[in-house]
């Protein structure tokens, strides 16, 4: 229970400035609700800005425009198959029905939110009932970060940046790995060289995938004049005498600010990627940080939610991805590298333990399961 004295009032308070938080804010604004986003770090974008920027939405408008519309019942069958009973039919149906509407809403909310679909990036299990070799991953086009103006410096960027002018769309990356095999791979190489030339001649600062997605979402927020407070961590959720959440305490400019949220607080502050004590509690097999996620992700929102009675699930899960760690500590995704011919992956006993081209979640699950047997699988070795 808290005393009802507030320094600031809004209808909806969104905690976190990644893709989920910004989407929630745009929707609240569309419902004529006074909305505020608060972000713990000095930069916006969260883990979404560091990601591949793909959104799996069968039946999205960009798919329909290309003349391909997966059948909702097939999509439901596929999701039910791959989730193995962990998700209710009601929730699966909601995703199948509402995700395309979400994409349609975003496209209509701002001209910056442009989405494209390219066939051929297959579902992870296209052989299963309802799976598709065409795929349903939706992306955004590249964008010149100069469009952000002064906000460009506030976009969270990856630790390992490509040389100036080098950026990959998802399809570019797949073809680039064929550079020694066919003309399509060589064409991508020529394209990359031309991008470097343009960057140096004209000052372009092009960005793709997650960087482009979050730049576009930030521009959409600006279109709607939705305020975003940076360097403003949420430290506590406030409740009334009945235990209902009525707002939050946010640290701003060195002092606590009590914010009333008349219609609710949206927690979109990410996971606990870099809280090693908490991670070891759920997955002791992982001894080091090794996370690509937002450096500010320490589980603050989850803890605050638990304190007011929120339930949690799947805290032992993550978006797993095998990676290589350079001597200086930088991490590099291992996506196409695992699928190249004439190479294989072995554990500490020198034995293969999985199909190298398996989906990255399956690959990492196999590493964790193998580590529990007492044979080293973390790390494993690419031969």
Language-model features, listed with the residues they occupy:
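Extreme N-terminal leader/targeting segments of oxidoreductases
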Residues: 1-12, 30, 215
